[in-house]
Amino acid sequence: MEWNGLKMIISTMEPQVSNGPTSNTSNGPSSNSRNCPSPMQTGAATDDSKTNLIVNYLPQNMTQEEFRSLFGSIGEIESCKLVRDKITGTQFEENFKDLATGTKWKPLTEEGPIFGKGQSLGYGFVNYIDPKDAEKAINTLNGLRLQTKTIKVSYARPSSASIRDANLYVSGLPKTMTQKELEQLFSQYGRIITSRILVDQVTGVSRGVGFIRFDKRIEAEEAIKGLNGQKPSGAAEPITVKFANNPSQKTSQALLSQLYQSPNRRYPGPLHHQAQRFRLDNLLNMAYGVKRFSPITIDGMTSLVGMNIPGHTGTGWCIFVYNLSPDSDESVLWQLFGPFGAVNNVKVIRDFNTNKCKGFGFVTMTNYDEAAMAIASLNGYRLGDRVLQVSFKTNKTHKS
């Protein structure tokens, strides 16, 4: 596979990829944490940590198989686990502290206490055999858009007392405060690893509660000293800032669970068109190239279920990619389409006997506008010595 050529594809689209979430969408790290150098870049990584990665901000409906497929496309994996919520009580808190700080973990079964069959908690771990593959995974997949999430891929930090218990719980926040403003408030005290603002699952309105994880515990302690009991701009009352995972606080387990178990969040993606509202007449004109239809406004994609519109599958917009080389795998499709928007899944069709690509594959994207832009940009694109043919999947398209 020509990785240099694929990296050039990403670099030409960097303005779309590198912005990162900076609003209160709570679907990924802010640009501050997104652009922080990895331990490999700073020379801070140890031998044990050069193959072990932590992946944050994964879609909650992502499966273990999809998780393995995505990272397995980079190189051979020793172990790969998507963390799920089949955890209760102190066991959750202790395991969470170990996982979040990158402590060397032992692979468990899917039915184990950490990796149960419950809903994904939005993060996981990948341990490669070759350190070069781990580095390649960071360079390739960090910042990739998956559905409404922008994933963060980094080295799992070695366990040490200085980085444990650095997660803060913040309450009393103004309902209008964004994730970016929350980070600006706390960033004066140290490097922020992740941040969250909890929102109502139905209305999408902030609950006035957030979480800040610092790089080191001492930074979190300084933030508590400086901000606990203070009134930030726009606040009607003083905010409360305290450690979220202090074992002496009985509420910490519930707070951590609340942080990672909010299903079906309705966050707009930061790197794609915010409006999901579009006109059906424009859609049909682009799809069929025929006369203008009567204007019908559609809000979201659910109204299109059952309609015979090319590419629409009920879960997204399926794109047919033809003339791939025999050596192509899923990572090629991830890298080609990821910069254009939220990708649900990719599939390369392989020959049963040789396991080589049969020359075509499929990509499903969440948003129509992003799918249409990807098609317009990549149809006719030269990849290596081949010219790609990219279009919405139709009934006549090769079956997968």
Curated annotation (Swiss-Prot):
The keyword Ligase does not apply. The keyword Ribonucleoprotein applies. Residues 18-33 have a biased composition (Low complexity). Expression is neural-specific. In the retina, expressed in the ganglion cell layer from stage 28 onwards and in amacrine cells from stage 35 onwards. Expressed in the tailbud and adult brain; in tailbuds, expression is predominant in the cortical plate. Residues 34-44 have a biased composition (Polar residues). One of its GO terms (molecular function) is RNA binding. Residues 51-158, 166-246, 317-395 form the RRM domain. Keywords: Cell projection, Cytoplasm, Developmental protein, Repeat, Ribonucleoprotein, RNA-binding. GO terms for cellular component: cytoplasm; dendrite; growth cone; perikaryon; ribonucleoprotein complex. It is found in: Cytoplasm; Perikaryon; Cell projection, Axon; Cell projection, Dendrite. It holds the Pfam family RRM_1. InterPro entries: ELAD_HU_SF, HuD_RRM3, Hud_Sxl_RNA, Nucleotide-bd_a/b_plait_sf, RBD_domain_sf, RRM_dom. SMART domains: RRM. Residues 12-48 are annotated as: Disordered. Belongs to the RRM elav family. RNA-binding protein that is involved in the post-transcriptional regulation of mRNAs. Plays a role in the regulation of mRNA stability, alternative splicing and translation. Binds to AU-rich element (ARE) sequences in the 3' untranslated region (3'UTR) of target mRNAs. Mainly play a role in neuron-specific RNA processing. This is ELAV-like protein 4. The lineage of its organism: Eukaryota, Metazoa, Chordata, Craniata, Vertebrata.
